[in-house]
Swiss-Prot record:
PROSITE patterns: PROA. Belongs to the gamma-glutamyl phosphate reductase family. Its EC number is 1.2.1.41. Keywords: Amino-acid biosynthesis, Cytoplasm, NADP, Oxidoreductase, Proline biosynthesis. This is Gamma-glutamyl phosphate reductase. Catalyzes the NADPH-dependent reduction of L-glutamate 5-phosphate into L-glutamate 5-semialdehyde and phosphate. The product spontaneously undergoes cyclization to form 1-pyrroline-5-carboxylate. One of its GO terms (molecular function) is glutamate-5-semialdehyde dehydrogenase activity.
Length: 417
């Protein structure tokens, strides 16, 4: 089955690579319109997926990721339309010039070819990834989590109908609908057809891909994000940032999971934190230095377990640790961070600059929420993933991250001397 999908995707990629920006946008507009026109079938499929997932004990955080509503589906369709408005990087001349030999040389952006994406219970990813791949002239093979089988099947059927109505092959966007995990291992060895693989899931999936894949892999999406509250931070303003970073949408990978508090501000900061977190419904997981003081406040508090510093809660839970200074905070982030998004709240710009220079994450913030690490917020449009590695892309992966380049030399029957 996967062999045939690979063949179809590779053939489709050749046709997609020849499309003009106008032709690609016409396809995307058709997909957006059809997602809205056929919303009932997608929402019905999703309701069945959610019911099964709840019966099987899926966590509330994962159920939130899985669930579609009419408003969320309209938002997904609108995101596709936003991709239409983005500049098409394909065909862009990155640099070039005329060599001493007279050869005119340029470096031009081109599609990667076929992208493989493995992800969990995130039906929006199906459309986001498909739209970005189509905009950049790439075919895509999707493997969503078993919890989203019906939703993905309904969504991909709508996308394929839109492709065919525009004269393009359905093989441009395909989904593996068999939940058998053995197919993941088979997919990881499809280097004959897939040019780049993006796993969006937990640490176990990333480890599997790194160990078994014969395809270049871009990993990311695991967000153990930190905020360091420096001793010079403005408490009231800092709390606004922390509330946003923790509570706006707790199930996302750019949500803060650990708060590092400078010991010199702890006595005044912790009582205010407890009051604010109680109002926000957040459970605090406190270290020994913070526990007694937080227990005197209104927020729910438990003693932190050592392993929780490495946890991506994806829920209304927040670690709180007292640190001696900036060096201590940076050391903690280096040991427990996932190189996703980390922030410092401070009025000391020297400390801010040190934090920016010494924290090796894909996104580092000064006096701002970690929730900004998002393709839309960065002006990139919908994102295919957030890469936490350094090659071939880093941070939110927009359109340019789905391209490569080729060198083109134009001469007048020019030969090398």
């Amino acid at each position: 089955m996967l062999e045939q999908m690979g063949i179809a995707a590779k053939q489709a990629s050749y046709k997609l690579a020849q499309l003009s920006s106008r032709e690609k946008n016409r396809v995307l507009e058709k997909i957006a319109d059809e997602l809205e026109a056929q919303s009932e079938s997608i929402l019905n499929a999703n309701a069945q997926d959610v019911a099964d997932a709840r019966a099987n004990g899926l966590s509330e955080a994962m159920l939130d990721r899985l669930a579609l509503t009419p408003a969320r589906l309209k938002g997904i369709a609108d995101d596709v339309r936003q991709v239409c408005n983005l500049a098409d990087p394909v065909g862009q001349v990155i640099d070039g010039g005329v060599l001493d030999s007279g050869l005119r040389l340029e470096r031009r952006r081109v599609p990667l070819g076929v992208i493989g994406v493995i992800y969990e219970a995130r039906p929006n990813v199906t459309v986001d990834v498909a739209s970005l791949c189509l905009k950049t002239g790439n075919a895509v093979i999707l493997r969503g989590g078993k919890e989203t089988c019906r939703t993905n099947a309904a969504t991909v059927a709508v996308i394929q109908d839109a492709l065919k109505s525009c004269g393009l092959p359905a093989g441009a966007v395909q989904a593996i609908d068999n939940p058998d995990r053995a197919l993941v291992s088979e997919m990881l060895r499809m280097d004959k057809y897939i040019d780049m693989l993006i796993p969006r899931g937990g640490a176990g999936l990333h480890k599997l891909c790194r160990e078994q894949s014969t395809i270049p892999v871009i990993t990311g999406g695991i967000g153990v994000c930190h905020i360091y509250v420096d001793e010079s931070a403005e408490i009231a303003e800092a709390l606004k940032v922390i509330v946003n970073a923790k509570t706006q949408r707790p199930s996302t990978c750019n949500t803060v999971e650990t708060l590092l508090v400078n010991k010199n501000i702890a006595d005044s900061f912790l009582p205010a934190l407890s009051k604010q977190m109680a109002e926000s419904g957040v459970t605090l997981h406190a270290d020994a230095a913070a526990l007694a003081q937080l227990q005197a406040g209104p927020a729910k508090v438990v003693a932190v377990k050592a392993e929780e510093y490495d946890d991506e809660f994806l829920s209304l839970d927040l670690n709180v640790k007292i640190v001696s200074d900036l060096d201590d905070a940076i050391a903690h982030i280096r040991e427990h961070g996932t190189q996703h998004s980390d922030a410092i709240l401070t009025r000391d710009m020297r400390n801010a600059q040190r934090f920016v220079n010494e924290v090796d994450s894909s996104a580092v913030y000064v006096n701002a929420s970690t929730r900004f690490t998002d393709g839309g917020q960065f002006g990139l449009g919908a994102e295919v993933a957030v890469s936490t590695q350094k090659l071939h892309a880093r941070g939110p992966m927009g359109l340019e991250a789905l391209t490569t380049y080729k060198w083109i030399g134009i001469g007048d029957y020019t030969i090398r001397a």
